[in-house]
């Protein structure tokens, strides 16, 4: 007797994405495969996405719904220009609250602006599912805050950077933070 395993194909979830890389906007419809891989319909976008996927120090910058990729943190820092007096002041008066579960639920870790090379000592290593960040200084109540999340401890691996004025959370596994 032959037993066949029936595999239910994933419904074609056609979505569209736009991102920026090296000053160029890329837009394509995409599909998710059964193994959760993404396949872009536009071949140029697919080729660019494959190149980005191979970069172990890629910076992914989220700003007002726009995703921009940078080859490294130095390239990102030049573009962001974070050294203005107003930005420095608001960075020093900022805080972030990280949650173990999505939608701001579960255990939380509230920290002020600073460098955190390893979240293991806070019991938040590889378990952050959402976060909120804001300025805490009355002089800068609406200033944007930049939060950087790193894939590996000691600021290693890929970087996920968020410029936050109003933020609704993200689901990203991280190990270290610098803000």
Can you say where each PLM-predicted feature lies in the sequence?
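Compact beta-sheet-dominated domain cores in extracellular/mature segments
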Residues: 1-179
């Amino acid at each position: 007797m032959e037993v066949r395993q029936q595999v239910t194909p994933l419904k074609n979830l056609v979505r569209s994405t736009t991102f920026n890389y090296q000053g160029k906007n890329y837009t394509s419809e995409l599909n998710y495969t059964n193994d959760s891989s993404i396949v872009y319909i536009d071949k140029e976008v697919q080729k660019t996405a494959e190149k980005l996927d191979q970069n172990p120090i890629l910076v992914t910058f989220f700003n007002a719904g726009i995703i921009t990729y940078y080859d490294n943190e130095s390239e990102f820092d030049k573009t962001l220009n974070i050294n203005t007096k107003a930005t420095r002041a608001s960075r020093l008066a900022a805080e972030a609250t990280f949650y173990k579960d999505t939608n701001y639920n579960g255990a939380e870790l509230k920290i002020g602006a600073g460098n955190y090379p390893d979240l293991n000592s806070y019991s938040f290593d590889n378990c952050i599912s959402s976060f909120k960040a804001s300025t805490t200084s009355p002089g800068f109540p609406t200033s944007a805050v930049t939060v950087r999340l790193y894939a590996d401890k000691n600021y290693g691996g890929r970087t996920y950077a968020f410029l936050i004025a109003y933020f609704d959370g993200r689901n990203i596994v991280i190990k270290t933070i610098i803000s």
